[in-house]
Every structure is written in structure tokens, then in C-alpha cells.
Amino acid sequence: MPATVEGRMDRLATVRRVTRGIDRWTVVRIGIVAGVFYAAWLAIEAFGRPYEFFDMKIYHGAVVWWASGNELYEFIQPDTTLGFTYPPFAGLAMLPMATLPVAAAGWINVLASIAALAVVLTALVGPIAKRCGWPRWFAVGLAVPLAAATEPVRETFGYGQVNLLLFALIMADMVALRWLARGRANHSLVGRGPLARFFFSGAWAGAGIGLATSIKLTPALFIVYLLLTKQWRVALTAVGTALGVTVATFVVAGHESMRYFTSVLWQTDRVGAADMTPNQSLAGVLARLYDSVETPGLLWLSFSLLMLAVGLSRAAHAHADGDELTAFTLVGLTANVISPISWSHHLVFVIPAVLVLADAALRRRGASQALSGVSGLRTPIWFPALTGLRHAAAAVGLYVLFVVSPIWPYEHRLPEVSHYADGLYGALMENSLALAIILLVAALPWRPGAEPAFYGDSPALHFTRQRNAA
């Protein structure tokens, strides 16, 4: 037998040994995940923008300036009017990157953000995959590139932003609340060490929100939500963490802390004009509608209070019905709406919003299929085939909107170009992401019993236990 034939047969035998025991569907799933990663990359190329770690250059330049003995909030990035705007604790946390080149700091942030996104999606998608009988690795493998293609995530990567790291801190508390509700410390952790029992018991819930608030003030709205829903221990942990970190920062960097809280915090013009297209908050919408660089103050305050009441009220109802994920999502989206500045890369809570809508569609369809077999039950002709269709369509539409991100083709800047230069359609597109999150705050559905976060018995938790037992 020729040597070439023998070599080919040896290679085939090696492949068979390696692939023996691997299910063919596993190979198919790996191929699908690879295809989705490639499609996500093409989407980023098609709809993303040129990224050069613009924000990371500001952070890096500011901490290098500070480490050289200068005042942190005196730094201005060359060729811009922008400086460091975060609380001083964020400056301390970023200080180690002063020893790195800016490109290295940017790529480390990208890798850390991807890891944070993967961990969060594992926690959020895992229960859905388990209920539907999908391999968790496959579901997460699809979710990560799909999320990476959206406007908030790709902008966070490209600008060197910290949004996904803060997102992970906040969602860690939601997972801790999940563990508290399940009481895992009472059964599955017996025999483990005290550190493991403490961690998986969820007793530290609130620390993530407290740390996030110390780095950026907008997560403080989650503390308000915790107080509103009477989750006292978690709220106290969050407040204690934020105060403890802030006081410790005063000890280490007293001058910068005093200047930030007495001066820099109130200088809203440090981050840019309200009407800038990437500002997809309510304030940005109103400024653009008025074709002004400034937001009409009283009108913004009135509508902000209304959206705050709607968002927190709906979040509290979602919590009471046992859906903590939707409650957290509503609070995050409400913070985006009412903040004076919410750049498009801040809108990361649209990711769990898509998941909530998709899961609501799956749950409704599953329930309809179960009911369709009940004898004597009269149902509409569309039942169950189209049940959950509107939630699925909303999930797909929301996802496509945040992948395509139609704000950029209609970007305008005063006084050179009016925000009405492209007519009504252009104005709608320029405000489309903001309008979407406002609509989500008002209409995002919750799923009773899906994510309970109670310390004792409650109707929602009792319902969930019965459903899981069945």
C-alpha cells in the first residue's frame, strides 16, 4: 500500500479516535456558535463606527496626569474639552493602568468586559436554557456574540468604557437575591467552607450596587428601588458599601473627593451638550425636539418625575410578582431615561430586556400548548400557534433596532445643522433608541414567579416552588 494512502488512513483513524463519543449535534451546535460569532463580527463592521479607545485615552491620560502629581480634575484631554468626570474612587481603581500603554489598558478592558458579559449571560440565560432543555454552553455561546453586536456593547468595547463591568456588579446582586430566595446555604452547601457558604448564600447582596454607585452615581437608583420594595438588608448593604468606599477614598484622596462633590459633580457641561445625538436620554430627546443645545428644564423635570414614578412602580410590581430580573431591568432603563446624559453605550440594560421579552414568548407558548390538550376548553382559532408572537416580535424588533442603531446616519450638531434637517423621519431615527427605552419602561412585561427574591414565604415564591416541584 502506498505511503500516502497509509498516511491518509492514519489521519482518518486519528480523527475517529478524537471524535469518538462526540455527539453529532454537538458538532452542529459548535458550527452554529461559530457562525453566529462571524455574523456578529460582520454586524459590528457594518453598523459600528471607527473605534480607537477614545474614552480610555481620557481615563488613561487623567490617571497618568494624577500620578505625576497634578490634580485629577484639572486634566483636559489634548484636542478636546473633555476631562475626568467620575468620582475619585473610580480614579483610584483606574490608577494601576497609569503604568501601561493606553492600547494595552484598552485591550485589557475589552477582555475584562467580555468576561463580565459572559458571566452575566451565563446567569441570565442559564435558567432559560435549563427549562427549555438546551445545553447551557450552547445558549450562552449564542448569547455572547449576539449581545456583542448591539450598540451599547460594541460602543463599550470600542471606546474603552466601563459599562459592562458596572452592569456585572449590579447583576451580581440580582444573582445573590436569587440565591437568597432559594436558600442554598441550607442544603447544597453543607460541608463546604465558611467562605463558600457565605458567597453562595447571597448574604452579600447589595455590595455590587454599592461598588457600582461609588464608581458612577446613576446606579444609586437601585438603592432607591431596594428601599421602595422593603429589601432592607440588601439596601443597607448597598448604602454601607457605597459610604464605606467613599469615606475611605476621602482618607486617601481628600482633596479630589472634596472638589468632586462640591464642584465637579454639578458641572454638567463637562461631558458634552445635551442635544448631541449619542445622548439617548429623555433630556437629549427634549433638547433635539426643541432644536436647542440645552434641555428645557421644567419640562424635563416634569417628564423625568413621571418616568421615575412609572419605572419604579412597575419595578416594584415586578418584584412583588416574583420577577426580579425584570425589576432590575426596569430600574436600569429608568436610570437611562431620567439621567441628563445617557450615551448610547450606557444602554446595556436593553440586553436583559430582550431576554425578558424572548422568555415571556417562550413561557406563553409553553403554557398555551399545555392548555390546548385540555378537553372541553374552548380556545381562539389562533391558539396556541400564535401565542407569544407579539412578545417574540418585540424581542426581535428591539434587538434589530439596537444592532442597526439608526441614530448615526441622522446625526446632527447645532448650530451647524438643525435636528430637523432630515424631516420627521430623520428626527424619529435620531431619537429612536431613547424612544425605545422610554417605551420599555412603560410596557416591558414581567413574568410572575420567574425570578423571586424574597426571604420568607410569599405567594410568588410559593407558586414558583410548586411549579419547580411539578
Placement of each model-derived feature along the sequence:
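Transmembrane helices and adjacent periplasmic/lumenal helix-loop junctions
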Residues: 209-226, 338-349
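Primarily membrane-embedded glycan-assembly and transfer machineries that use lipid-linked glycans
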Residues: 2-203, 232-347, 419-427, 446-470
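Hydrophobic/aromatic-rich transmembrane helices and adjacent perimembrane loops
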Residues: 344-359, 433
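The feature captures the transmembrane alpha-helix scaffold of multi-pass secondary transporters
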Residues: 203-207, 396
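Aromatic-enriched
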Residues: 45, 358-362, 376-470
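Hydrophobic transmembrane alpha-helices
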Residues: 101, 116, 216-219, 353
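Loop-to-helix entry and N-terminal half of a specific, functionally important transmembrane alpha helix
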Residues: 136-146, 324-332, 369, 373-376, ...
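Perimembrane helix-loop-helix junctions
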Residues: 221-243, 360-364
